[in-house]
Amino acid sequence: AQAIGKGGALPWRLPEDLALFRRVTSGRPVIMGRKTWESLPPRFRPLPGRRNIVLSRNPNFAADGAEAVRSLAEATEAASRDEQAWIIGGAAVYAEALDVVDVLVVTDVDVDVEGADAFAPSIGGSWRKAAGLPERGWLASGRLNYRVSVYFQPGVNADDVVRAVAGRGPSRI
């Protein structure tokens, strides 16, 4: 499984992935778990230019500048008035959301993370790969190699997401 967290933080610094994240989520609701919310640097809470929706089982949890909800169903209902929302972590939210979402944008980083404590769920079942950036091999950022893949469920048109990921589409998809 791909490591996605260590000690409450991303285990790498990948500016290109952060730029992609900003580009595809700007103007859209972002849904995240409490630990992901707490891992954001305070100056980025809430993430600017996006509706921030935070999941927590704690009924007393409050996220200043964000909407606190108790379940993924409640989060998706809160975001339903928007055309598209993004699930941005963490591991438990990703795993639960695989049954709800129809498009995935996945950044694979070619690195072994010793002591990782959060992992992305496996993508299987009916998911189909729409595109990869690059189509073969890896992109490089400093000493890290990475690639971005877009997956979709059958019957879903992922073209707008593919164009945005490739930097050829609207900044708001």
Regions found by a protein language model. Name each.
Residues 1-173:
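Enzymes that bind and transform nitrogen-containing heteroaromatic metabolites
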